[in-house]
Amino acid sequence: MDITAISLVLFGSTFGLIFRMFIQNNLKINIGFNIQNTSIVNFIASFFLGILLALNLTNNNLLLLFYIGFLGCFSTFSSFIYQLFVLLQKRKFMHLFFHYFEVIIISFICFYLGYYLMQIIK
């Protein structure tokens, strides 16, 4: 990797981290049940991923900046796994089951929405 590639990944990841921390610390959503902020971040990241995939980027610099840098640092798969582990330790198996499917299914729906919207706009 050259210095340009490293700089693009660092730049994208810096903004991904800032955006992630802002959402995790400041956004509270309650729609009858609490959605954890980590889940919200994953939904947004999935939506952005759908948009980026639909754009069919071929510029390597944009891929480094957005896919690897921004989304790589913004999305929180490890936090999602940790939340599942905590639910497992607390023996809250129903919560674990529903949280797992909530995140997977809603993340896929958000991804598809982003992808579909870009297909319409194109």
UniProtKB/Swiss-Prot annotation:
The record's listing under InterPro entries reads: FluC (IPR003691)
Q: What protein family does this chain belong to?
A: Belongs to the fluoride channel Fluc/FEX (TC 1.A.43) family.
Single Gene Ontology MF annotation: fluoride channel activity
Q: Which Pfam families match?
A: CRCB
Q: What is the lineage of its organism?
A: Bacteria, Bacillati, Cyanobacteriota, Cyanophyceae, Synechococcales
List of residues binding Na(+) = G72, S75
- List the gene name: fluC2
What does it do?
A: Fluoride-specific ion channel. Important for reducing fluoride concentration in the cell, thus reducing its toxicity.
Instruction: Explain what switches its activity on or off, per the activity regulation comment.
Output: Na(+) is not transported, but it plays an essential structural role and its presence is essential for fluoride channel function.
Entries under PANTHER family matching the protein: FLUORIDE EXPORT PROTEIN 1-RELATED
Instruction: Tell me which positions the record assigns to the signal sequence.
Output: none
Q: Does the keyword Magnesium apply?
A: no
Q: How does it sit in the membrane?
A: Multi-pass membrane protein
TM segment ranges = 3-23, 38-58, 62-82, 93-113
The alphabetized list of GO BP terms reads: cellular detoxification of fluoride
**HAMAP family per the UniProt record, alphabetical:** FluC
- Substrates-to-products reaction catalysed: fluoride(in) = fluoride(out)
Q: What is its main location?
A: membrane
Report whether Thylakoid shows up as a keyword of the record.
Answer: no
Cellular component (GO) terms are: plasma membrane
Give the highest taxon in the source lineage.
Bacteria
Instruction: Name it.
Output: Fluoride-specific ion channel FluC 2
**Which keywords label this protein?**
Cell inner membrane, Cell membrane, Ion channel, Ion transport, Membrane, Metal-binding, Sodium, Transmembrane, Transmembrane helix, Transport
Subcellular localization(s) per the UniProt record: Cell inner membrane
